[in-house]
């Protein structure tokens, strides 16, 4: 169970970071610091 849960969690975390990264880089006003 843990061997399958870890990779899935890692992929979700990576996808979330990849989705948030370009938004923060392209527009600072839309970043997590400013809502």
Swiss-Prot record:
Potently activates insect G protein-coupled receptor. It activates the ACP receptor (ACPR) from the mosquito A.aegypti (EC(50)=0.55 nM) with a potency comparable to that of the endogenous ligand. Has no activity on receptors of the closely related neuropeptides adipokinetic hormone and corazonin. In vivo, does not reveal any observable effects when injected into crickets (A.domesticus). Does not induce increase in intracellular calcium in mouse DRG neurons, suggesting that it does not induce pain. InterPro entries: Adipokinetic_hormone_CS. Its main location: secreted. This is Z-limacoditoxin(1)-Dv1. Belongs to the limacoditoxin-1 (ACP-like) family. Residues 1-22 form the signal peptide. The modification Proline amide is found at residue 32. It comes from Doratifera vulnerans. GO terms for cellular component: extracellular region. Expressed by the venom secretory cell of the spine. The spine is a cuticular structure containing a single large nucleated venom-secreting cell at its base. It is an independent unit capable of producing, storing and injecting venom. On the back of D.vulnerans caterpillars, spines are grouped together by 50 to 100 to form scoli, of which there are eight in D.vulnerans. Keywords: Amidation, G-protein coupled receptor impairing toxin, Pyrrolidone carboxylic acid, Secreted, Signal, Toxin. One of its GO terms (molecular function) is hormone activity. The modification Pyrrolidone carboxylic acid is found at residue 23. Extremely abundant peptide in the venom (almost one-quarter of all toxin-encoding transcripts, and the highest represented peptide by proteomics methods). It is found in: Secreted. The lineage of its organism: Eukaryota, Metazoa, Ecdysozoa, Arthropoda, Hexapoda.
């Amino acid at each position: 169970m843990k061997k399958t849960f870890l990779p899935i969690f890692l992929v979700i975390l990576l996808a979330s970071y990849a989705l948030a990264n370009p938004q923060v880089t392209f527009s600072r006003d839309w970043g997590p610091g400013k809502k």
